[in-house]
Amino acid sequence: MCIRDRSLEIYWKKALEQTRLSIDDESLYPLKTDIITSDLYEKDDFIIRKLDTSKFNKKKIYGPKQNPFCPWEKILEIDKIGDNHQLILNKYPVQKGHILLITNKWKPQNGWLDINDWRAIQQVNKDTSGLWFFNSSPIAGASQPHRHFQLLRRSKGEISCPREKWFLELNSYQDLDSKLKKNIIVSKFNFLENPSCLFEFYLELCKKLGLGDPISDKKPIHPYNILITNKWIAIIKRKNDHIHGFSINGLGFAGYLLVTENSNINYLKKFGPEKLLESFV
């Protein structure tokens, strides 16, 4: 495995360069949003954005139905990762340099992750790290059935997400009736472990959360999200994908909510973001 110096952030620099080229080529469509947190919520553990649809071309956004990762657009290409994965830009980024790690051949998004996936994630993270998230199926917020992981780069010392403190304190949370706690498992995480250890740890957490086991189940028996940082990992068991006009993927549980013209703002203001998340587990 190629070991990269984290301080170099070669993948991140390539992502920024390809972002510039892709925007010039009109191959990238950054989603324009406005932060409206203060209008709806008083705390700082969520960031609420409203999607600006004034330049939102639905035909372009949803595009053709063929697999966009097979083949992927060459102008979005960042680097090859091992023998089985490719690093590319997200065509519809939520932040600058929004990175996707995809399998270079078809693998289902809703299947069990394997050791090669964890080896590839680890290789990228040794160079460029941040908030990783994975959505296992449409119910968990996945937009494509081809296996892909997403990375939002974070600088050294930067908080990974608004809900980080909540995740770190979840295991000491005393409310045994908490619907979120019953459907989320969180643990300390060490990216320096051997990839086989990361893979086995993932399977262990899935089993504890009631997602099944690859020995007896062909695929996880519930949709789920994964959040990964340099310090912790969380897996969220999912039940719904669209409620009160909101669609939630892994980023929603990390504390990033997106409001669209269909979202029930009054519900969000009355009950708050955490109550909204409970509807999705």
Language-model region placement:
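Generic beta-strand structural signal
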Residues: D83-H85, G97-H98, T128-F134, P145-F149
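Active-site microenvironments that recognize anionic phosphate/pyrophosphate groups
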Residues: R4-L113, S155-V281
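Catalytic micro-motifs at enzyme active sites that drive phosphoryl/nucleotidyl and oxygen chemistry
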Residues: Q86-K91, I121, W132-G141
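Intrinsically disordered, low-complexity linker/loop segments enriched in Gly/Pro
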Residues: K105-D127
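A short glycine-rich, hydrophobically flanked beta-strand micro-motif that places a catalytic Asp/Glu
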Residues: G130-S143, R147, P214-T229
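Hydrophobic/aromatic-lined pockets within catalytic cores
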Residues: K126-S129, R154
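Histidine-centered divalent-metal-coordination microenvironment in nucleic-acid enzymes
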Residues: T103, S137-C161
